[in-house]
């Protein structure tokens, strides 16, 4: 009872922090807030914390506090807890696809609502600022502008604030270990889309802001004078130009046409974000930067934690080479490491490339495989083909390689086993997109039947019969009735007319499939190189708190040292200020001094966080790991794919040759076999064409919006769409 009450209090606190931060953004452009905030800053200047401490506490700390409270909340939840299964009252769903477009992807109703609210906020912010500017137009001292030029110049300036709003949210969606999206059960693979949206908005508003400013400077013949100016106080224009150019370069190289063909160009160019953020700080000033700081702060700490984790080495224990040029890699893991189905890891193999990291879905279940973790990759690119060749060489070489060292980051995945909330599951996979469903089916096979979905329909589309070998890791689950999954599998082979081995059923084909199993690791490696995974949520919350206190301490300390303090001689200051003979302490020093203080404080704080993470990592590594052997990690009955014996089954799975799946017909057939009304989770993973086809089906399918609709209709189900695709 006490734990439930604690969770409720934490949830309330998170809502208050989020509402408070959003409210600050809404009231920020109002005249009342501007006047009140100036008075608050004047008062804070005479205190120990100063105006910088006040800005950090009000604008930067709420999102960071939300992250800390969220991590504590997640630490108190049962590990990978199962959400309550939805009933009739939960008929309405916000995951229903509303827009399906090849350029912007698949957008749900909830995402459209959130996007409209954000655009409404931007419109309000822009209107409030511009209307206030037009009421009190002040001429620019260095330029002689007429009325329309002055108005246009003010409008251009305010577009910069819209870019600032996008930048403040830009880095939150790409957090991994410290991601707040997992509180909404939104996976990293899905949240990357929001990063793209915010980045596009940032570049658009920045281009309007910078281009319009350059236009005014050009027509007034001040461009050469203004563009290279590094002002002692105020905005540094050359820094703004640097920020705009680097941001535009990152955006161009992230376009799908460039990113997919030249991933390395995209990857390395994106590291210019450091230059972009530093230039933005010098251009906008410290006061504006406090709004952007939360995302940057959490992203920097998250990056350091990932670097610390990725420095730990693991190894490949065994590999299974399938005839379709797919590889299953088995890695050792700590038995205490648990992860949700559909989780993924980032993998680096120094033997192939020291710098390239690639994401792969985990195909094993931590409920079943306590000592190992498995992934599968399809060899379709240079890096994956190199991995395949290296492992093949290791198998054929007389002097066999004892182990292949790898580095792993993750696992990352949903905070809860979300698919268990549905009464039934409809899974659609295309090619290598089957991988997240392998872990889901293994998880379902290990669960109590009462907690699992009643029926599971898997639609698997491949180009050739050889691609069906990717089903081998779950062959025993598919054909063995003891698992009682009530699984129906429909396989579609689109580019071949008959199998080369003359088989007629899926079971016969898989039984005759050739798999080359290679054991690389020694018995010692099973205990030397286990994957331990990210740190616990509670420890992460503590680390964030330590880091933020370090930042605040150095921010205040360095500011007191380098910026003249006013609170020591308050009476003298008031006399000088009344006579107009004194400028504020902020105006005494160049504007880049507070900016440098923020940078130095940030670097020190992140370094302290990285040092603490390194110490904990070493402590975990030096703890005595439980001894494991090859027999424990790789069970013969699970890994010997070539001895798949025919098992009598009650329902034969279907193979359709030379045709594509007709999803509407399959869904209608699936609905006929349901008893009573139920919620259906529709999960898809595969190429964009497959994802869009499934989304179109869900959008066109009739939907009920309440109990009365259900009574009047003859519908048996509501569809809830989820895409498991990972796209960088």
UniProtKB/Swiss-Prot annotation:
<dbReference type="GO" id="GO:0000293">
    <property type="term" value="F:ferric-chelate reductase activity"/>
</dbReference>
<feature type="transmembrane region" description="Helical">
    <location>
        <begin position="269"/>
        <end position="293"/>
    </location>
</feature>
<keyword id="KW-0274">FAD</keyword>
<dbReference type="InterPro" id="IPR050369">
    <property type="entry name" value="RBOH/FRE"/>
</dbReference>
<keyword id="KW-1133">Transmembrane helix</keyword>
<keyword id="KW-0408">Iron</keyword>
<dbReference type="Pfam" id="PF08030">
    <property type="entry name" value="NAD_binding_6"/>
</dbReference>
<feature type="transit peptide" description="Mitochondrion">
    <location>
        <begin position="1"/>
        <end position="24"/>
    </location>
</feature>
<dbReference type="InterPro" id="IPR013130">
    <property type="entry name" value="Fe3_Rdtase_TM_dom"/>
</dbReference>
<dbReference type="GO" id="GO:0005739">
    <property type="term" value="C:mitochondrion"/>
</dbReference>
<feature type="transmembrane region" description="Helical">
    <location>
        <begin position="595"/>
        <end position="616"/>
    </location>
</feature>
<keyword id="KW-0560">Oxidoreductase</keyword>
<dbReference type="Pfam" id="PF08022">
    <property type="entry name" value="FAD_binding_8"/>
</dbReference>
<feature type="domain" description="Ferric oxidoreductase">
    <location>
        <begin position="159"/>
        <end position="281"/>
    </location>
</feature>
<dbReference type="InterPro" id="IPR039261">
    <property type="entry name" value="FNR_nucleotide-bd"/>
</dbReference>
<dbReference type="Pfam" id="PF01794">
    <property type="entry name" value="Ferric_reduct"/>
</dbReference>
<keyword id="KW-0520">NAD</keyword>
<dbReference type="GO" id="GO:0046872">
    <property type="term" value="F:metal ion binding"/>
</dbReference>
<dbReference type="InterPro" id="IPR017927">
    <property type="entry name" value="FAD-bd_FR_type"/>
</dbReference>
<dbReference type="GO" id="GO:0006811">
    <property type="term" value="P:monoatomic ion transport"/>
</dbReference>
<dbReference type="InterPro" id="IPR013121">
    <property type="entry name" value="Fe_red_NAD-bd_6"/>
</dbReference>
<feature type="binding site">
    <location>
        <begin position="358"/>
        <end position="361"/>
    </location>
    <ligand>
        <name>FAD</name>
    </ligand>
</feature>
<keyword id="KW-0406">Ion transport</keyword>
<feature type="transmembrane region" description="Helical">
    <location>
        <begin position="537"/>
        <end position="559"/>
    </location>
</feature>
<comment type="similarity">
    <text>Belongs to the ferric reductase (FRE) family.</text>
</comment>
<feature type="binding site" description="axial binding residue">
    <location>
        <position position="270"/>
    </location>
    <ligand>
        <name>heme</name>
    </ligand>
</feature>
<keyword id="KW-0496">Mitochondrion</keyword>
<feature type="domain" description="FAD-binding FR-type">
    <location>
        <begin position="300"/>
        <end position="418"/>
    </location>
</feature>
<keyword id="KW-0813">Transport</keyword>
<feature type="transmembrane region" description="Helical">
    <location>
        <begin position="104"/>
        <end position="127"/>
    </location>
</feature>
<dbReference type="GO" id="GO:0031966">
    <property type="term" value="C:mitochondrial membrane"/>
</dbReference>
<feature type="binding site">
    <location>
        <begin position="410"/>
        <end position="413"/>
    </location>
    <ligand>
        <name>NAD(+)</name>
    </ligand>
</feature>
<feature type="transmembrane region" description="Helical">
    <location>
        <begin position="316"/>
        <end position="336"/>
    </location>
</feature>
<feature type="binding site" description="axial binding residue">
    <location>
        <position position="195"/>
    </location>
    <ligand>
        <name>heme</name>
    </ligand>
</feature>
<feature type="binding site" description="axial binding residue">
    <location>
        <position position="209"/>
    </location>
    <ligand>
        <name>heme</name>
    </ligand>
</feature>
<comment type="function">
    <text>Ferric chelate reductase probably involved in iron reduction in leaf veins for transport. May participate in the transport of electrons to a Fe(3+) ion via FAD and heme intermediates.</text>
</comment>
<keyword id="KW-0812">Transmembrane</keyword>
<dbReference type="InterPro" id="IPR013112">
    <property type="entry name" value="FAD-bd_8"/>
</dbReference>
<keyword id="KW-0285">Flavoprotein</keyword>
<feature type="binding site" description="axial binding residue">
    <location>
        <position position="283"/>
    </location>
    <ligand>
        <name>heme</name>
    </ligand>
</feature>
<feature type="transmembrane region" description="Helical">
    <location>
        <begin position="56"/>
        <end position="74"/>
    </location>
</feature>
<protein>
    <recommendedName>
        <fullName>Ferric reduction oxidase 8, mitochondrial</fullName>
        <ecNumber>1.16.1.7</ecNumber>
    </recommendedName>
</protein>
């Amino acid at each position: 009872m006490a734990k439930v009450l604690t969770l409720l209090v934490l949830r309330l606190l998170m809502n208050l922090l989020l509402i408070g931060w959003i409210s600050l953004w809404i009231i920020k452009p109002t005249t009342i807030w501007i006047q009140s905030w100036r008075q608050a800053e004047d008062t804070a200047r005479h205190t120990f914390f100063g105006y910088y401490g006040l800005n950090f506490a009000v604008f930067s700390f709420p999102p960071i506090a939300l992250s800390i409270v969220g991590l504590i909340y997640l630490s108190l939840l049962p590990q990978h807890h199962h959400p309550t299964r939805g009933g009739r009252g939960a008929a309405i769903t916000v995951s229903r696809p509303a827009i399906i477009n090849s350029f912007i992807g698949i957008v749900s109703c909830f995402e459209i609502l959130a996007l409209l609210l954000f655009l409404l906020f931007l419109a309000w912010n822009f209107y409030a600022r511009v209307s206030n500017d037009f009421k009190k137009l002040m001429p620019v001292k260095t330029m002689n502008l007429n009325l329309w030029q002055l108005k246009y110049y003010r409008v251009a300036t305010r577009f910069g604030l819209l870019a600032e709003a996008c930048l403040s949210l830009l880095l939150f969606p790409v957090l991994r270990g410290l991601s707040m999206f997992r509180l909404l059960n939104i996976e990293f693979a899905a949240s990357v889309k929001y990063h793209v949206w915010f980045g596009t908005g940032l570049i658009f508003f920045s281009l309007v802001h910078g281009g319009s400013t350059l236009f005014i400077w050009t027509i007034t013949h001040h461009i050469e004078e203004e563009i290279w100016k590094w002002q002692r106080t105020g905005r540094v224009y050359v820094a703004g130009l640097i920020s705009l150019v680097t941001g535009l370069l990152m955006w161009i190289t992230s376009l799908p046409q460039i990113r997919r063909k030249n991933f390395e160009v995209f990857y390395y160019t994106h590291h210019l974000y450091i230059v972009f953020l530093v230039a933005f700080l010098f251009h906008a000033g410290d006061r504006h930067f406090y709004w952007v700081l939360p995302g940057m702060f959490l992203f920097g700490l998250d990056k350091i934690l990932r670097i610390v984790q990725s420095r730990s080495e693991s190894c490949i224990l065994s590999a299974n080479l399938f005839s379709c040029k797919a590889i299953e890699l088995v890695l050792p893991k700590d038995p205490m490491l648990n992860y949700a189905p559909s989780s993924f890891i980032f993998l680096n193999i120094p033997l192939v490339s020291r710098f390239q990291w690639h994401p792969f879905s985990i195909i094993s279940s931590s409920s079943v495989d306590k000592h190992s973790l498995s992934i599968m990759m399809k060899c379709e690119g240079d890096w994956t083909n190199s991995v395949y060749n290296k492992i093949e060489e290791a198998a054929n070489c007389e002097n066999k390689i004892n182990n292949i060292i790898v580095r792993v980051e993750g696992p990352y995945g949903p905070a809860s086993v979300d698919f268990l909330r549905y009464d039934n599951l409809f899974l659609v996979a295309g090619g290598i997109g089957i991988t997240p469903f392998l872990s889901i089916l293994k998880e379902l096979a290990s669960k109590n039947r009462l907690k699992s979905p009643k029926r599971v329909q898997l639609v698997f589309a491949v180009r050739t019969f050889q691609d069906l070998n990717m089903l081998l890791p779950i062959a025993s689950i598919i054909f063995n009735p003891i698992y009682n999954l009530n699984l129906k599998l429909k396989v579609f082979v689109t580019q071949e007319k008959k199998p080369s081995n003359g088989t007629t059923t899926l079971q016969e084909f898989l039984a005759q499939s050739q798999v080359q199993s290679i054991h690389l690791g020694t018995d010692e490696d099973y205990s030397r190189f286990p994957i331990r995974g990210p740190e616990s949520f509670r420890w992460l919350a503590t680390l964030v708190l330590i880091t933020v206190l370090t930042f605040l301490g150095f921010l205040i300390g360095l500011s007191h040292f380098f910026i003249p303090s006013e609170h020591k001689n308050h009476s003298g200051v008031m006399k000088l200020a009344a006579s107009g003979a004194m400028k504020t302490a902020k105006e005494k020093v160049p504007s880049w001094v507070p900016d440098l203080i923020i940078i130095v404080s940030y670097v020190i704080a992140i370094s302290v966080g990285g040092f603490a993470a390194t110490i904990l990592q070493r402590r975990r590594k030096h703890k005595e790991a439980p001894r494991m052997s090859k027999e424990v990690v790789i069970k013969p009955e699970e890994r010997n794919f070539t001895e798949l014996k025919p098992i009598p089954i009650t329902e034969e799975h279907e193979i359709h040759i030379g045709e594509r799946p007709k999803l509407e017909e399959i869904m209608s057939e699936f609905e006929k076999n349901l008893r009573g009304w139920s919620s259906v989770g529709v999960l898809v993973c595969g190429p964009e064409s497959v994802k869009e086809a499934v989304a179109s089906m869900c959008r066109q399918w009739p939907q009920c919006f309440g109990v009365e609709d259900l009574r009047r209709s003859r519908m048996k189900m509501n569809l809830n769409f989820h895409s498991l695709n990972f796209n960088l």
